Amino acid sequence: MPRLKTRREKRLRRHKRIRKKVFGTPERPRLCVYRSLKHFYAQIIDDTIGHTLVSASTLDPEFEKITGKRGGKSIKDAEVVAEIIARRALEKGIKKVVFDRGGFKYHGKIKAFADKCREMGLEF
């Protein structure tokens, strides 16, 4: 009898498949997102050297200043994280990125995050 696959296993399988195709370079680093049940995280990564260039999350002190709360899991919170990471990326001169949705469906928080990043000036 085939083993039932959990949501997490399916997401990790999709993530592996995506990572084979998506690779960040110095000219066009990878914008990677992760969402847990309580928080939302985003990083811009240069995969050639394996360094995180910019990061932001709902645990960030700047997020707490803007929203007045620590942590968050709503669509609005994902948009605030997008504003923070887009601003930091543009300050470092990063305008073009490759979007890595981390195996999550392009829907809800992930879509809102991507739309806000585009609105702030990131191209992907």
UniProtKB/Swiss-Prot annotation:
> Which is a Gene Ontology cellular component entry for this protein?
cytosolic large ribosomal subunit
Question: Which GO MF terms does the UniProt record name?
Answer: 5S rRNA binding; structural constituent of ribosome
Q: Which residues form a coiled coil?
A: none
- Is this entry keyworded Ribosomal protein? yes
Its function, per the record, reads: This is one of the proteins that bind and probably mediate the attachment of the 5S RNA into the large ribosomal subunit, where it forms part of the central protuberance.
Q: Which family does it belong to?
A: Belongs to the universal ribosomal protein uL18 family.
Alphabetical list of PANTHER family matching this protein: 39S RIBOSOMAL PROTEIN L18, MITOCHONDRIAL, LARGE RIBOSOMAL SUBUNIT PROTEIN UL18M
Q: Which NCBIfam families match?
A: L18_bact
Task: State the protein's name.
Answer: Large ribosomal subunit protein uL18
Q: Which gene encodes it?
A: rplR
